[in-house]
């Protein structure tokens, strides 16, 4: 018997395998090697046992550690504004204590890094005019986003609550509220230590990790957690017995035997696609739209249900690898250097590497990897073409090209449907895209209304505001664009957030996704 949404013979993955792969995608955005968060989860569970935590708390520790930084990609746009390369600064932040002079020195060294001196001084002035307030706002947004995304992918309320304390410190000098001591859930106190300890042990060795733990005892970390960790630290940090860190980490999962139904998997891949799209404001709703277009085009081409299902899932997951490329590149308004362009071209390969972790999604992985390949071999990452690309790969490539054209990019405005159609036809005539797949994508796109419904909850002006906020515009930029005062914009934003129950840009973006407003929000002016 098969579950809802399951096709006969379909070998579906376990829940923890999908979430484990998601953690590898999170590693990409942290600038850490694959399996960092998985290994941190293993360390955290071992530490939980040393502390005598009951099973239900250890379960929360596991998933809180595994997806601890799920919110970091949602605020990549903001990080890039302050620090330039969001991935590089996150990588380097692991090496400093986040308080006092060392952290101030770290901030000074990374604000607007790589920009001309005048621009650096301008950004520094803006940030340090109210450094605590600016960082608290950023951290609050991160924590709210992490909690929302955790629930969006089906994790427990306990995990969502724990993630709100990610940036707090035992000594009360953390953010966003300055919680201290036992005000911070023990699950987060354990997760924080495991996350940092894994990096220092892997990078500098056991002695350096031990010195780091002692120096931060009672400051960043709970003394009881540090003391438990430093009792035989070599055992706590030991590699998996057979060297398979993936297997070791998954064995600690509380629901390690839970296998997904097809319907549950579909909800999960949709949520993961939404999560990826939040990395850049201008890609909001991209993966959902691509999945819908590609699946409908596949049906029009006469594909069977299983092939269409694979195509739809590939549409949701095709851009996972974008998490491994800095927003500094995605937001570039000019030309990329050869090395920068090479990093961008790697993102489909990174998608493949992440999906390779999930049993039962081999077909999805193959199709998703090829979303930028061309029939004439001029695409990337492999440059394959012709018979090397199946019908599903060709259909996804056409759907991605069409949907991307409809969306704004930092270097161009969104195209009209007519302009997107001509762009697609041109690529078909040039031999890059399959003519039949292009025809199918354009046919199904032509049957869709040009604008999705508005939500009656919001006024037309609030719809405008929601669209601009979701696309990453600041209040000042919105005021300039709409010829309003900043105070008026701020009032509109506050009313809109109150109406939709959001507290930040990510919450507003998710609301727009869940209520079918994204096509309207991405319409060109």
Protein language model regions, located:
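Basic, Lys/Arg-enriched C-terminal extension of HTH/homeodomain DNA-binding domains
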Residues: 498-525
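Hydrophobic residues on short alpha-helical segments
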Residues: 191, 396, 466-467, 497, ...
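Short, locally clustered residues in the helix-turn-helix/winged-helix DNA-binding domain
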Residues: 277, 467-471, 513
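Hydrophobic, well-ordered secondary-structure elements that form the walls
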Residues: 400, 420, 465, 469, ...
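Recognition helix of helix-turn-helix DNA-binding domains
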Residues: 473-507
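Conserved acidic segment of CheY-like receiver
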Residues: 458-459, 469
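Histidine- and acidic-residue-rich, metal-dependent catalytic cores
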Residues: 2-457, 463, 519
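Short helix/strand-capping hinge loops at secondary-structure junctions
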Residues: 204, 280, 472-473, 503
């Amino acid at each position: 018997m098969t579950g809802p949404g399951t096709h006969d013979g379909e070998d579906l993955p376990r829940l923890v395998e999908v979430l484990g792969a998601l953690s590898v995608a999170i590693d990409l955005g942290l600038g850490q090697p694959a399996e960092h968060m998985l290994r941190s989860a293993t360390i955290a569970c071992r530490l939980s046992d040393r502390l005598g935590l009951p099973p239900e708390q250890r379960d929360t520790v596991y998933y809180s550690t595994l997806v601890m930084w799920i919110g970091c990609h949602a605020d990549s746009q903001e990080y890039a504004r302050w620090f330039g390369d969001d991935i590089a600064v996150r990588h380097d932040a692991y090496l400093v204590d986040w308080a006092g002079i060392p952290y101030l020195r770290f901030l000074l060294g990374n604000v607007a890094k790589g920009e001309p001196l005048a621009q650096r001084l301008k950004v520094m002035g803006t940030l340090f005019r109210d450094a605590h307030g600016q960082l608290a706002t950023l951290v609050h947004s991160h924590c709210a986003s992490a909690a929302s995304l955790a629930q969006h992918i089906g994790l427990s309320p306990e995990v969502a609550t724990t993630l709100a304390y990610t940036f707090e410190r035992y000594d009360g000098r953390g953010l966003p509220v300055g919680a201290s001591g036992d005000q911070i859930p023990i699950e987060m106190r354990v997760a924080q230590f495991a996350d940092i300890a894994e990096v220092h042990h892997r990078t500098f060795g056991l002695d350096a990790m031990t010195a780091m733990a002692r120096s931060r005892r009672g400051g960043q970390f709970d003394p009881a957690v540090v003391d438990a960790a430093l009792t035989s630290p070599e055992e706590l940090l030991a590699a998996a017995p057979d060297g398979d860190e993936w297997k070791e980490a998954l064995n600690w999962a509380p629901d390690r035997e839970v296998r997904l139904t097809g319907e549950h998997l579909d909800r999960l891949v949709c949520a993961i696609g939404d999560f990826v799209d939040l990395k850049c404001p201008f890609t909001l709703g991209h993966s959902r739209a691509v999945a819908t277009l590609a699946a409908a085009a596949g049906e029009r081409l006469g594909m069977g249900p299983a092939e269409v299902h694979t195509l739809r899932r590939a549409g949701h997951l095709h851009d996972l690898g974008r998490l491994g490329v800095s927003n500094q590149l995605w937001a570039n308004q000019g030309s990329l250097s050869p090395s920068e362009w090479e990093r961008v071209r790697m993102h489909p390969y990174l998608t493949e590497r992440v999906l390779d972790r999930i049993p039962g999604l081999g077909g999805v992985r193959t199709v998703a990897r090829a979303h930028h390949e061309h029939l004439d071999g001029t695409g990337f990452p492999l440059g394959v073409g012709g018979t090397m690309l199946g019908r599903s790969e060709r259909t996804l490539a056409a759907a991605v090209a069409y949907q991307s054209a409809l969306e704004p990019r930092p270097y161009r405005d969104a195209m009209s449907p007519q302009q997107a159609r001509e762009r697609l036809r041109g690529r078909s005539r040039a031999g890059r895209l399959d003519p039949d797949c292009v025809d199918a994508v354009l046919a199904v796109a032509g049957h869709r209304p040009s604008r999705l419904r508005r939500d009656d909850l919001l006024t037309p002006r609030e719809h405008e505001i929601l669209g601009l906020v979701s696309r990453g515009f600041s209040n000042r930029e919105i005021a300039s664009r709409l010829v309003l005062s900043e105070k008026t914009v701020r009032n509109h934003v506050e009313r809109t957030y109150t109406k939709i129950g959001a507290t930040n840009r990510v919450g507003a973006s998710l609301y727009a996704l869940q209520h079918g407003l994204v096509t309207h929000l991405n319409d060109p002016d």
